[in-house]
Amino acid sequence: MDWLLLDDKINKLMRKVAQLNGDEYHESFYNPHPYPGWCPELKHMMWGFIKELKEKESAGVATKVDLQTLSELFDIIIRLSDLSLTENKFQQNTNAFGEAVTAFNYKLLNAITEANDSEVKNVFISPGRLQAILVLMSNWVGWYMREQILEAICCKEMDPMEVNEMFADERYIIPYASKEDLEEGYVPTIDLKTMMWYQKGQNLDKRGLIDIEKPFNVHFKNIDFRSPSAMGKINSEVEKASHGLIKNLQVELTEETRALLMDVFYFKANWQSRFDEDNTRTRNFYYKGGCSKVKMMSQTDDFRYYENDTFQSISLDYNSNVHTRDYSMWIHLPKQGHKIKEVLTQITEERIGPKYEQKEVHLLLPRFEIETTTSLCEVLKMMGMEEMFASEDAIPNLLSNVRIYDIVQQGKITVNETGTEAAMATYCPMCLGCPPDVKPTPIEMNVNHEFIFEIVETYTGNRLFSGIVNKL
């Protein structure tokens, strides 16, 4: 037998195994060092098998296993090892992206509070969809702008293709459910549509289409922006995709409009623990400079809950089934004497999710409906994306000589006794150029003043929506 060839194949496999754990592998055929690898049983099995074959060959005993069979076996094992390496890298990227999603959410909320008078205005955004749109656009921009985008969205440690890969399974956020399940509210209703409208006569660069088809499923639509019917066609698509929540985009089409990138996300889900309408009462909601009368829902139940000296936080779960991801609304309520900015600072610096514990809580939560339109141009500049709005040729890998003059999020959310319904249109116009024995008293959480809310996909931590309610 060609033992040197087998030795080379085994060392290749062991080197792959070492890579899985980030260790060094020192090649040694006759005296392999003990290796606490990804599959130590495989290593011992292989070395034992080879030792037995060598002993039989030395003793002149014929073996039924030939070199070709062994080589093919080791090739298969090496390919499986390659697959494990790929999966391991994907898992590392998934974990890193989960951290990036959380970091970007709070980075964005902090920037918005700095840029706007957020103690008066309500804030409603979709960090997850903004991040997706920015990643999509990073495929079309130059390298310098791409670096700015990836750093701003907290993904600078990943290369563009790896970031794209994180969105390749976006279709799986759509629940697998029967029509009856959806109609009865047993699972969330989720819709997502991304469209790129571009001026008739403009030619798309095929370079910009290669890497985005699977991750983003963009629908490219040719239109004459100068036509009187153009805005009507666009609004019709928005209204359909948002299930009627958003009817008219707050955007003006001009003679110089060359493209409109648009992403519409819709979410509707029922509470796992619904509020009884009979318990809803008219109560005060306090805001800076006054108070208003609101319909305050209430219930006492076991919730995931956390508090410290600065704020209370609660997780309200939505209905789901085994085929869907889990979704929750997190509410962060400043304690008396503390402000939204203090809470934002703390939840930015520490992970709240793992700190939740099951507690009995008497919760008072207002019904609310918020409708906002938020220009993010200045906010994104503050976050380091100045080049995006300065370039006269912003997306050369898709359309030449176009300038991005804003990125806007326009959305609506309704929260009531049954659950939550929300939609967000993100658009980018472009122009030319264990329980104790004694049951404790339920924790009181009275959401009767400013608070932060997030709708979170539990597994990845993706923030579908976030907001700050200052006044009702």
Predicted features, each with a name:
Residues 2-24:
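Short terminal alpha-helical segments
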Residues 22-36, 55-67:
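Charged, low-complexity interaction regions
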Residues 3-10, 34-53:
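Short amphipathic alpha-helical heptad-repeat segments
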Residues 40, 44, 63-71:
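Short, charged, amphipathic alpha-helical segments
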Residues 13, 17, 46-58, 70:
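Leucine-/aliphatic-rich long alpha-helical segments
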Residues 4, 8, 29, 341-342:
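Gram-negative host-targeted secretion-system effectors, predominantly Type III and Type IV
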Residues 11, 18, 51, 77-79, ...:
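Residues marking helix boundaries in flexible regions
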Residues 33, 74-472:
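Secretory/exported precursors with cleavable N-terminal leaders
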